Amino acid sequence: MATAQLATFKIPPVSNEPMLSYAPGSPERAGLQAALAEMQSQLPFEVPCIINGQEVRTNNIQKQPMPHDHARHLCTFHEGSPELVEKATCGALQAKDGWETMPWNDRAAIFLKAADLASGKYRYKLMAATMLGQGKNTWQAEIDAAAELADFFRFGVSYVEELYAQQPPKNAPGCWNRTEYRPLEGFVLAVSPFNFTAIGGNLPGSPALVGNVVVWKPAPAATYSNYLVFKILSEAGVPPGVIQFIPGGAEIVQAAIQSPNFRSLHFTGSTNVFKSLWKDISSNLDKYKVYPRIVGETGGKNWHVIHKSAEVRNAVLQSVRGAFEYQGQKCSALSRLYVSRSVWENGFKTQYLEEIAKIKVGPCLDWNNYMGPVIGRRAYDNITGFIKKAKEEGGEVLIGGSGDDSKGFFIQPTVILTKVPRSTTMVGEIFGPVVTAYVFEDSDYEKTLELIDTTSIYGLTGAIFASERQALLTATNRSRNAAGNIYYNEKCTGAVVGQQPFGGARGSGTNDKAGSISIFYRFVSARSIKENFVGLEDFHYPSNLV
């Protein structure tokens, strides 16, 4: 029996989750230390597939190693199969009617509760899983697994309330016009990355919030933290079958996009994989019931440009954080550094290298370590391969350049100086703690902006450091399509939900702006309704009369 909604409810005001300091002696540090100790004492965890609310063990066992100690595993997980994907899609479609017809205030309450669970009851457990499994230090885990995840859920509810309130402004006499925002017909496939637990929650969460059903394939290197997010959503009240959790590899994705009921892809990951999936989806158009929607955030080759008028100290420190937080494994991380010669030679170079030399690299369990490991063997080999290539091309390694994979996948923060602005490390996405610097003549500022715009296929983030307003404006205009997020005198990373909607175009994705109302338009199908209160007495129009 349907439940009547007897009032128009207004959600509580939302704000960004406060981030805790984890200072020595603080209760949050003690809580996190306890969670880390407990988790390490229970390794490895077992992660099943979850289909229609039931645990499914396929006995095709894969492992999630800990990148700081790769001989040990955070969890083993049961890898899904194409047959299981078919079962999952059928189950999701069976759950669809009950979920999309659930009153909006009830769906909203579920996600508000999930936010409170993530930022409260399960805060330290989520952080511990993210630190051990994905190699984040305490602060990076805090801003991701605790704060941003909660922000995605809370602000998502606020944005959907705003979306539903968007109604036609005019009504003719005797009529009432209105718009409803239907969930998509079919299911959404969410394919989430390793580098942000919060994105793991947002990719299935955003479509589900507006009434869609979702098949979710987490990244193998983030399986355990994403499993915890799934459990939180279930505890908050997401019904069985609404989100189907299937760990595994590419075959999961391929099986899902073969279904005639596939309706949308919500993806974060590499540009090459996204392009390949787009082609595969396009080749299946004739089998789909509805044209699919493709939403993706992919790679970046992000940049800082330091104008001659820049405040040097701020530019130095922002460029340290932008490049080396989370080992450069953020889609938005600094990779290309363009510095005017007068700034480079009058303090920037010296200070930049001095600050980088202070960075401690090691396991996340040591509170002194600013950088941890890169995510795995493939990443380690790829990053060190880029460094080797840079040396072969004549690049000068100013600091770092070495790695140690004997126990964990550790790479030293690396700065390469190049005289070739289109060298390999200025063009290709490295996704690691490597910055390539190019020094330009002060008089070549506008030429350098053209280089920034034309050097890579990407268009995700960029930052401009200058005290002269005209320098900021010139760079903003000349880089109009080179970045979806631009920062003035601030590092190119760290977009906050509700403050800086995030996403880029070109080779960086569809720029649908996670963390804003924009993303939700992609997962609804609007329907206009016109109700007439006054009947016709004659079908003729006055113009027909003589």
From Swiss-Prot:
Keyword Oxidoreductase: yes
Coiled-coil ranges from the UniProt annotation: none
GO terms classed as biological process: proline catabolic process to glutamate
Enzyme class at the top of the EC tree: oxidoreductase
Localization: Cytoplasm
Keyword Oxidoreductase listed: yes
Cited InterPro entries: Ald_DH/histidinol_DH, Ald_DH_C, Ald_DH_CS_CYS, Ald_DH_N, Aldehyde_DH_dom, P5CDH/ALDH4A1, Proline_metab_enzyme
Residue numbers marked as site, Transition state stabilizer: N195
Binding site for NAD(+): K279, D280, I281, S282, S283, N284
Positions annotated as active site in the UniProt record: E297, C331
Gene Ontology CC entries for this record: mitochondrial matrix
Pathway this chain belongs to: Amino-acid degradation; L-proline degradation into L-glutamate; L-glutamate from L-proline: step 2/2
EC number(s) reported in the record: 1.2.1.88
GO molecular function terms attached to this record: 1-pyrroline-5-carboxylate dehydrogenase activity
Keywords: Cytoplasm, NAD, Oxidoreductase, Proline metabolism
Gene3D superfamilies to which the protein is assigned, alphabetical: Aldehyde Dehydrogenase, Chain A, domain 1, Aldehyde Dehydrogenase, Chain A, domain 2
Principal location listed in the UniProt entry: cytoplasm
Catalysed reaction equations from the record: L-glutamate 5-semialdehyde + NAD(+) + H2O = L-glutamate + NADH + 2 H(+)
Family that this chain belongs to: Belongs to the aldehyde dehydrogenase family.
Protein name: Delta-1-pyrroline-5-carboxylate dehydrogenase
UniProt gene name: pruA
